[in-house]
Amino acid sequence: MKARNILFLILASLLLCTAVSAAEYTDVSDAHWAYKQINYLDAEITGYPDGTYKPENTVTRAEFLTLFARIAFQEEWKQAESDDWWKAAYSVCIAHDLLDGINGGRVNAMPRSEIAALLDRFCSGWGGVHERADAANQLNINWTEQRMESPEWQPLFPDAAEYGNSVLISANQGLLTGYPDGSFKPEKGVTRAEAAAILARLKAQLALREKGCEYVCTVGDYWLMQYPASGSVGLALYEPLTGKLVQTVGLWKAAQGVNGYVAFDRLLSGSDGIYVWGRAGL
């Protein structure tokens, strides 16, 4: 058991030590689906001594929570005193009441349902998060019989219904996505590539929030964000990882011609704004 723990500490340190860019990994080409996300996290995540990133390796609870804490609570994580590399992250997350229901061993894979619960709690204070989820859920209920015009529409993640709103909220916030078959696979762990994608979205949204932007939905390769305009509220499309403004969108206008996507298929009223749910690449 002692030897196993030592091995775990060695492997974990490889995930969290000196950072390099994705371009330097021999097993992550620029054609890899998570190349940009891995590169975006070059200050938080790293690879192995042999120059690989091992994108298909599964991430443990301790590893995911440490990376999460470094992004979500950077200064607190730096100041937290700990004898072990993973304890600072746990201490910070516990201080923010984020670990209720996350009781599995730290050396085990962190299932997607727990990641959803963690992100749900973390985002609970953000404006419109729960309203978007409620609106989307109501749409699913109301349109079970009356289908959307798009034949591709279906209720969000049927295999995650028992996990309450946490999966719905995390997905509606643009932080978690499902699989091509429409499933969420709540008990499945995440790979290093998937963890990078999830945490890159979180880091990017935190950066945009510092500019006063609120996430609305994903439109193709872009995020539709609500931003403060002079005397009103505006909508605009942003590149997620660069934060670059792509196109402004009026509140009541459809944004067309951006990668062939239409920003608005349906407009839903939330308690603090207008929320989008429908075809729009969601």
Each language-model region and where it sits:
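N-terminal propeptides
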Residues: 9, 17-212
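Surface-exposed loop/turn elements that mediate protein-protein interactions on large endomembrane-trafficking
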Residues: 234-257, 281-282
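Hydrophobic residues embedded in beta-strands of well-ordered beta-sheets
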Residues: 53, 184, 223, 233, ...
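Beta-strand C-termini and the immediately following turn/loop, strongest in propeller blades
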Residues: 225-231, 266, 277-281
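Positively charged n-region of N-terminal signal peptides that target proteins for export
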Residues: 1-5, 10
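Repeated scaffold domains used in trafficking and secretory/extracellular systems
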Residues: 211-218, 253-271
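Generic beta-strand structural signal
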Residues: 178, 218-219, 226-228, 238-240, ...
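Structural core positions within WD40/WD-like beta-propeller blades
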Residues: 65, 116, 224-226, 275
